[in-house]
Amino acid sequence: MSQFFRQAQDPVSCATHAWGAVAAFFGGMVLLLRALWAGANMAALAAAMVFAFSLMALYSASAIYHYCPGSVLSGGIKRRLRKLDHSMIYVLIAGSYTPFAMVLMPQPKGARFCLILWCVAIAGVLGKLFWINAPRAFSTVLYLAMGWALLFVWKDFSAVGMPCLLLLAAGGICYSVGAVFYIVKRPNLSPDWTFHALLHLLILAGSLFHFLAVFFFVL
């Protein structure tokens, strides 16, 4: 690990999500080129860009928060960065659903489903801004409820085909296992590889599975 990341308050968490932000940026470029090459319509292109933006937003906010040590930042600034970090989880979940809801689901049902998710995401962001010390389990349950919202529209999602469903399920499982680690604060394999660092790896894995689903089945 480079000296830059070793200076961070949480070196492993910072490094994993800093590289995640870089990967999300280039992944967004790949999705853009894929959409243009495939002649995707504007709805598909816009939905894919929303997904890419949500990835970049989450990983950038997370990397910045986990880099800045408390000795450098005042409590107020660090608290705001923490709020931003946690808030972006809602944005990522809604952003991950957007391509599938807007392109693969029948309309206008897909648009309504997408709108509901974004309304919940906005409510979650506002909740984080004004109730940052909410119980850990409360926000995690809301994350999981949003993440598995596809069960409410299963008939429409099941029509996308088994390969796409497997990628979506794999991503959802990665996020869900990470959420469990976050609630129980386990396992802690070493001083560097704590439950939080493992959570970051699982988020990266979940994002990759969903990126592949967008790349191969939406565009």
Predicted features by range, described:
Residues M1-L219:
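Multi-pass alpha-helical transmembrane bundles in non-GPCR membrane proteins
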